[in-house]
């Protein structure tokens, strides 16, 4: 039986970087509060390796992020630093750890950020590497179903569905920036404050999960509704 009060959750203090937005600065606070409340058991991940990243991302892009050399090193956040680089490597390693824990326990989490806008050759929108596609790449024998709920659609993840046959993307997003639709990419746009439509789309996604019976479901939780 799954104990929902002690979910094993990937987190490292190196997730922190003093970014211009709270995107990476907030992560230690979230992890500490969740642990103090007894909801999670924090587990230290290993940073993702260059070889693993190059399975899904262009080598020149990966090297640019690792070294800080070239304009691509700034494409996600508009700046580069060593703690930013170390943070995104740890966060993506956390996604791999969370996937393994979920396959063992039935549920797991990663106190991370910044995956779904990252495409094979570049990042963007505060997303550097696509840790969702990375999980699918390293678990080729199972279908990985991404349920993405964010104001912006998972356009980077949708790009990866073209090249990873075991990756499925279902984006529930706002009416602005959205992902493309394809054989394994579904997009449902929700008008502002239309709670009923949002619930209808969520039920559609859950029904599809029941039909497809993927080996792993990843909930990509957007932070756009959060104010404070």
Regions found by a protein language model. Give the residues of each.
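HDAC/HDAC-like amidohydrolase catalytic core signature
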Residues: 1-228
């Amino acid at each position: 039986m799954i104990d929902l009060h002690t979910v094993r959750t990937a987190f490292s203090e190196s997730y922190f970087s003093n970014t211009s937005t709270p995107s990476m600065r907030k992560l230690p606070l979230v992890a500490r509060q969740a642990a103090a409340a007894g909801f999670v058991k924090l587990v230290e991940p290993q940073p993702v390796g260059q070889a693993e990243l190059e399975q899904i991302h262009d080598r020149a892009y990966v090297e640019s992020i690792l070294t800080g050399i070239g304009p691509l090193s700034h494409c996600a956040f508009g700046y580069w630093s060593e703690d930013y680089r170390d943070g995104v490597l740890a966060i993506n390693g956390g996604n791999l750890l969370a996937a393994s824990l979920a396959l063992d326990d039935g549920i797991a989490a990663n106190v991370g950020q910044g995956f779904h806008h990252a495409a094979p050759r570049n990042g963007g929108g505060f997303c550097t590497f696509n840790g969702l596609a990375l999980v699918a790449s390293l678990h080729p024998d199972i279908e990985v179903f991404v349920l993405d709920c964010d104001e912006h659609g998972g356009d980077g993840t949708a790009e990866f569905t073209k090249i990873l046959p075991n990756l499925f993307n279902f984006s529930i997003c706002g009416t602005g920036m959205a992902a493309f639709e394809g054989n394994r990419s579904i997009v449902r746009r929700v008008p502002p404050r239309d709670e009923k439509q949002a619930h209808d789309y969520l039920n559609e996604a859950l029904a599809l999960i029941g039909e497809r019976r993927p080996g792993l479901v990843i909930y990509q939780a957007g932070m756009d509704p959060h104010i404070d």
